[in-house]
């Protein structure tokens, strides 16, 4: 049986690494790209190179920065340091920014606690978070994590970790769909959940 040329197989193997993309989808995308004008494929390749060379996260809050040399927009003095929003991913930050309801600072956790897989929070990030709270002394820490098993476990851990501090700890209001990622929640629903957040 004849196999795909190596350049097709290699592309398919990389595409399969993307979330939600299986072999069939990767195969379809690869052959769709064969129909593109070579200049379009080259432009996409350059965009990927620029992405690799330019993307950077802030070492203090772990939000995405505009470039490796730029300062962090989310750590600027224009943000309200009395409110600290804890999120799971840099993408979650932009979900809240679209809702235009939060003007405070963020902290991106990255990995969440997983009772099933035994995954733990990054000790390094946890120490940086503690330092951020010590430096800025926010009056409220808003735990804005997905309503999933991992999100709930992480929220409970954070509550226990910081309950001794004179800081209000809250979670997004009930009504957020259980098990659903912020990716699938519209800005209005997110804004209502944020404004109606409860003490945790």
UniProtKB/Swiss-Prot annotation:
Query: What protein name does the entry list?
Result: Recombination protein RecR
Do you know which PANTHER family this protein is assigned to?
RECOMBINATION PROTEIN RECR
Which species is this record about? Chlamydia muridarum (strain MoPn / Nigg)
| Ranges for domain Toprim | 82-177
Short name of one Pfam family: RecR_C
GO term, biological process aspect, one: DNA recombination
Does the record carry DNA damage as a key word? Answer: yes
Q: Which NCBIfam families match?
A: recR (TIGR00615)
Q: What does the UniProt function comment say about this protein?
A: May play a role in DNA repair. It seems to be involved in an RecBC-independent recombinational process of DNA repair. It may act with RecF and RecO.
The entry lists its GO molecular-function terms as: DNA binding; zinc ion binding
Q: Does the keyword DNA damage apply?
A: yes
Keywords, A to Z, come to: DNA damage, DNA recombination, DNA repair, Metal-binding, Zinc, Zinc-finger
Q: Where are the zinc fingers (C4-type)?
A: 58-75
**Which family does the record claim for this protein?**
Belongs to the RecR family.
